[in-house]
Each structure stands twice: as structure tokens, then as C-alpha cells.
């Protein structure tokens, strides 16, 4: 009897510890390092010219009118599912907040709800997600909505507004697991709209470094999962120019190993854009050499900072040269992977000459020549299984209705931003390790584990109670 009782107690003690073990596993998932998260990414896709769209000419500013202003349909869960099914395991969601925030940085509730819905769909599909502040930066002028400029005077004047904006975003998503990453700003330009490297020198660099530090401090202060969320900071105009890389200062952080640096590199610009050299459409050794130099520089940059570096945007325009585009993509992705750099292809949803689109969001079909070159040469990654779609929500119904009522706008509107740099295109127009496998559980899995743990604990206590009664009865019989 004594031997049986001891064995039973040991067993029940082990069972009682199970929920603690489960909780510890969940904790580990929620605090993966930046390096672990980047390692788990295979290849990413940009939901371009959608939530980042804007228009000073839009009379009735609503989430639907802005989302479709640059010619793309309203985003649906089916689109996000198609991205996952084609082999991507990460998505970058560019968002322009300017037309939905007041001067104090307070965000309109309907816009925040729409952004959250797209983020939810992406996470439910098992994707890693990057959420950013997009055309609140970039070129500024009469027809723009940019209010963040890379100079210290502007930084000081918008300091509180920027902090308030990121406080609002961070509070909205503070309980989301760490598959969601925040990117502080897209492409900060100096007062002269100078691409690649600033014309104003140290003042612009100091401003970028200040925005980066304020972003990190603001998000961390909101607590919750934001205390250890992996945060992304970009260089001046997200440029990979060597002078820009040299001037970048990584923000200080309250936790270690939770920062990522991002650049955008359409290299070489003469080949990737008709704005560079419209006659240069053949992939050649010059392209290879420039890509080699880019990846080598970024690898050294990553080593200097001590953080992973990602390429948040890259791509090549359609210049009726799909075979050469595919060769470029395959070489670019291969060299990036060899240097430990993960990439996100820019897709503006448009496929005509001079555009970057590879995914038709109306028919849910891909330019297979380009996408096969991308997916087949990307390293393997990992993602959680997609969650079953819930019943259609009111927001989805509104979105679908909007898609029908704005069809005419979608056909006639094609707002195009033009730039003259390798840092930014015309925006309008996988090694799997044990850690990454464990990281990719969604919150539904956590809930199930806790329920199981609770049932086990309850059963254990019942067992102990019955054992106690049995022992007491034996003693009384004696």
C-alpha cells in the first residue's frame, strides 16, 4: 500500500506541474528574439497601394474610399489566404494614418477597426505580420499627406503627435502575440525630398535616429506583449547607401535582442525601373555584381549593429521582360538568403507596363513566371496552420458592398507616385528549426492547452481527495 501511494503521489505531482510546463512554453513563444523571428520567415509579400493609399482629392474620406483610391479592390480574407497558399509566410501591411488622425495623433475608430481586421485575417492565416506607418513619411508637398520629415525642427514639432499615434496603435494590439511586428516609419525624407542620402547631412540622420528611439520608447511603455515585441526601425529613406548605413544608430531598448533593421533596395535601379533606364531590360552581370555588393554591405551592417536586417521592399517593374525579371528575382533572393537576409516583394496590385504587381487581387491569380522564381529560391520557413474563417462579420459585409459600389472608381483611378531613386519605386502604379516550429502556435492553441491543463488539474485534485479518503479509511479500520 505504501509503495502504491508513493507512486501515485509522484504521478499526481507530475500531472499538477503540467500546466506550469505548458505556460512556460507559451511564454517562450511570446518572447522569441528578433533573430529567431527573422529566421522563421521564408519570404514576404507587401499589401501595397491599399491601406497605404491616400488622396487629398477624396471628397468623402472613409476607410473604403481611401483603401480603393489607388485602383485596388477592397482587401478580403480570401486574398490573404491566397498569399499563404502560394508559399509566403509573412506579410507587410503598409498603412497611411494621416487622413484618419487628428493633429494630436488620435486615430479614427473606423480606420483602426479596418486595419485590425486585415491584421487579424493575416494572423489567422498563419502569417508573420509587419504593421507600419507609411506615407505619413516620404515625399511631401501640396498633394501629399506626409507630416514626418527627416529634420530636427520637424521632429521636435511632431514629437508628441508621433508618440500619440504609436501609443494608439500599440495599445490596440498590445495583447497580440509576437508574430505581429511593428515598423516605426517607412521612408523618412529630408526637407528637400532627397533620395538615397540626405542633402542636409547630419541633421537628417539625427532626426531619423530620434524618430527611431521615440518609436521604441513609446511602444515599450504600453506594456503587455509590446514589452518584448520585435520592433523594426529603418535607415534614412530606408536606403542601403553606404553613407546612410554608416550614419544609422540603433536605438537603445529596455530588452535585449528584440530589434530589427529594415532597408528597401530596388538594386540596380536602372534595371528595375523604367524611370532609371527604360532601355535596360536584360538581366546581366552588372545586375549580379550590384546585388552581390548590396548583400555583402547589408551583411556587414547587420554584424555591426548586432541585429538582423530585412529588405522590406524590393521588386522589378514589368517592362515586357518577364524572363529577365524572373532571373533577377531568383538571383536576388538566393544571394539574400546566403547572407541571412529575408525579403518582402513590393506588389502594388497593378500589372501594366511600369508596374510591380505579381498578384491579381480580383481573380486571385499570380504571375507564375515571377512568383515561381521567388518562392522556389526562398529559404524554407514555418507558419501556423490557418484558422477556419468565422462567419462573415458586419465589417466584411461593408467591405464587400463597398467593393461593388466603388468598382467604377477602381477602374478609372490609378494614382501614381513617381520617384527617382533606388530606394523607392512607383508605389502606386526556409530553414526550419525547433524554435521557429514552437513559436508558431496561435492563440487558439494556447486556449486549448490551458483548458486541457485545467481539466488535468481538476482531475488530479479529485484523485488526491479520493486517495486521502482511502488512506483515512484504512487507518480507521486498523
Kindly give the residue locations of the regions a language model identified:
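An active-site-proximal structural segment forming one wall of the substrate-binding cleft
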Residues: 70-91, 101-135, 139-184, 207-223
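Substrate-binding cleft of secreted/luminal carbohydrate-active enzymes
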Residues: 285-379
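C-terminal membrane-anchoring or membrane-association module
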Residues: 454-478
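Sec-dependent signal peptide cleavage junction
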Residues: 18-30, 436-446, 466-472
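Active-site region of glycoside hydrolase catalytic domains
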Residues: 156-277, 296-317, 338-341
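N-terminal carbohydrate-binding accessory modules
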Residues: 25-90
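Catalytic domains of carbohydrate-active enzymes, especially glycoside hydrolases
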Residues: 73-96, 294-302, 335, 339-344
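C-terminal low-complexity, Ser/Thr- and acidic/Pro-rich disordered "stalk" regions positioned immediately N-terminal
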Residues: 385-444
Amino acid at each position: 500500500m505504501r509503495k502504491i501511494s508513493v507512486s501515485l503521489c509522484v504521478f499526481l505531482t507530475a500531472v499538477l506541474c503540467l500546466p506550469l510546463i505548458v505556460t512556460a512554453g507559451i511564454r517562450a513563444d511570446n518572447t522569441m528574439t528578433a533573430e529567431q523571428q527573422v529566421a522563421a520567415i521564408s519570404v514576404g509579400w507587401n499589401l501595397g497601394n491599399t491601406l497605404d493609399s491616400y488622396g487629398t482629392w477624396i471628397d468623402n474620406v472613409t476607410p473604403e474610399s481611401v483603401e480603393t483610391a489607388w485602383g485596388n479592390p477592397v482587401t478580403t480574407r480570401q486574398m490573404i489566404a491566397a498569399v499563404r497558399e502560394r508559399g509566403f509566410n509573412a506579410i507587410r501591411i503598409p498603412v497611411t494614418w494621416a487622413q484618419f488622425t487628428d493633429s494630436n495623433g488620435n486615430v479614427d475608430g473606423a480606420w483602426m477597426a479596418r486595419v485590425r481586421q486585415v491584421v487579424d485575417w493575416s494572423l489567422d492565416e498563419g502569417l508573420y505580420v509587419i504593421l507600419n506607418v507609411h506615407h505619413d513619411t516620404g515625399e511631401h508637398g501640396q498633394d501629399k499627406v506626409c507630416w514626418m520629415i527627416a529634420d530636427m525642427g520637424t521632429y521636435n514639432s511632431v514629437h508628441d503627435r508621433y508618440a500619440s499615434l504609436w501609443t494608439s496603435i500599440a495599445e490596440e494590439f498590445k495583447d497580440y502575440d509576437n508574430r505581429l511586428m511593428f515598423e516605426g516609419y517607412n521612408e523618412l525624407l529630408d526637407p528637400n525630398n532627397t533620395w538615397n542620402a540626405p542633402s542636409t547631412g547630419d541633421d537628417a540622420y539625427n532626426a531619423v535616429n530620434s524618430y527611431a528611439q521615440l518609436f521604441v520608447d513609446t511602444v515599450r511603455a504600453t506594456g503587455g506583449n509590446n514589452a518584448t515585441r520585435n520592433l523594426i526601425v529603418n535607415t534614412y529613406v530606408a536606403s542601403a547607401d553606404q553613407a546612410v548605413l554608416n550614419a544609422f544608430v540603433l536605438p537603445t531598448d529596455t530588452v535585449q535582442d528584440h530589434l530589427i533593421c529594415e532597408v528597401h533596395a530596388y538594386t540596380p535601379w536602372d534595371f528595375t525601373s523604367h524611370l532609371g533606364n527604360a532601355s535596360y531590360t536584360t538581366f546581366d552581370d552588372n545586375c549580379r555584381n550590384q546585388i552581390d555588393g548590396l548583400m555583402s554591405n547589408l551583411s556587414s551592417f547587420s554584424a555591426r549593429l548586432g541585429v538582423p536586417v530585412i529588405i522590406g521592399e524590393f521588386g522589378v517593374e514589368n517592362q515586357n521582360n518577364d524572363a529577365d525579371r524572373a532571373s533577377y528575382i531568383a538571383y536576388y533572393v538566393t544571394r539574400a538568403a546566403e547572407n541571412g537576409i529575408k525579403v518582402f516583394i513590393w506588389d502594388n496590385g497593378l500589372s501594366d507596363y511600369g508596374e510591380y504587381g505579381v498578384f491579381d487581387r480580383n481573380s486571385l491569380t499570380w504571375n507564375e513566371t515571377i512568383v515561381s522564381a521567388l518562392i522556389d529560391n526562398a529559404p524554407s520557413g514555418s507558419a501556423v496552420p490557418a484558422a477556419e474563417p468565422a462567419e462573415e462579420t458586419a465589417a466584411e459585409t461593408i467591405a464587400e458592398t463597398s467593393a461593388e459600389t466603388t468598382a467604377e472608381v477602381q477602374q478609372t483611378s490609378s494614382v501614381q507616385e513617381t520617384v527617382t531613386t533606388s530606394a523607392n519605386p512607383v508605389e502606386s502604379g526556409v530553414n526550419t528549426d525547433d524554435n521557429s516550429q514552437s513559436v508558431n502556435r496561435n492563440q487558439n492553441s494556447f486556449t486549448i492547452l490551458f483548458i486541457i491543463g485545467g481539466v488535468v488539474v481538476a482531475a488530479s485534485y479529485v484523485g488526491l481527495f479520493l486517495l486521502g479518503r482511502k488512506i483515512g479509511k484504512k487507518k480507521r479500520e486498523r
